[in-house]
Amino acid sequence: NQALARLADGPVWSPAYITISDFFRQHSELTIADPIKSICDLYKSYVEVTGNTNETLDHFYGWGQLLLADFDDIDKNMADAESGEQKAELRRFFANFDDNPEGLRERFITLWAKLNDIYNDFRQRLRGQKLAYEGMLYRDVVENAKIEVQYEHYIFVGFNVLQKVEQLLFKRFLKEEKASFYWDYDRYYMKSTNEAG
C-alpha cells in the first residue's frame, strides 16, 4: 500500500488482497476439514473399503497422514488416483527394500491396490459433511464451480511454480480476460542461453 500511495498523485482506494488459498475457499461450498478429523474420516473409509478392523486408529494415523498428503497432491495436480503410472512407481520404490518382519511392504501394496476405492469413499464421506481437504476443494472449484467474480479484474502476483489446479484456474481467468499476471522469476534464467542451477 505504501508503494501504491507513493505512485499516486492523490488519494486512492487500496486494492483488496487475498491469498490463492483464500480465493479457492471463497468459491467453494465446501469447508476445509480439521486435519485430525480428516484422518479419522479417512480411517473410516479405509476400514469400509478394506474390511480391516484389526488396524487401530492409532496405528493407522501415521499411514493416514501420508495417504491424506498423497490425495492432496493427486487433486492439486488433477491426477487420477488409479493411475497405472503411480502403481509402477510404487513397485520400483519397494523393489529396493527387503521385506521387514511386520510385512510393511505387503501391507502397503495391499493398501495401494485399494487406493482408488479409498480415495473415492473418503471424498464422498467428506462431501456428505460439506468438508474437504485443500486439494479436494481446489479441484472442486476448477472442475465444477462457476466462479462468480467479485471484481471486474484480478491481478495475480508473485507466482513462479504452479500446480495443475492453479494453472487451470489462471487459464480460465485469462480466457475470460479477467486477470493480469505478474510472475516471480529471475529474468536471467528465463533467457534460453542461460541454465538454471
Regions found by a protein language model. Name each.
Residues 38, 158, 196-197:
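Generic detector of short, well-ordered, non-transmembrane alpha-helical segments enriched
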Residues 152, 166-197:
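Conserved RecA-like helicase ATPase core segment
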Residues 3-149, 164, 186:
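Basic/charged alpha-beta structural segments of nucleotide/phosphate-handling enzymes
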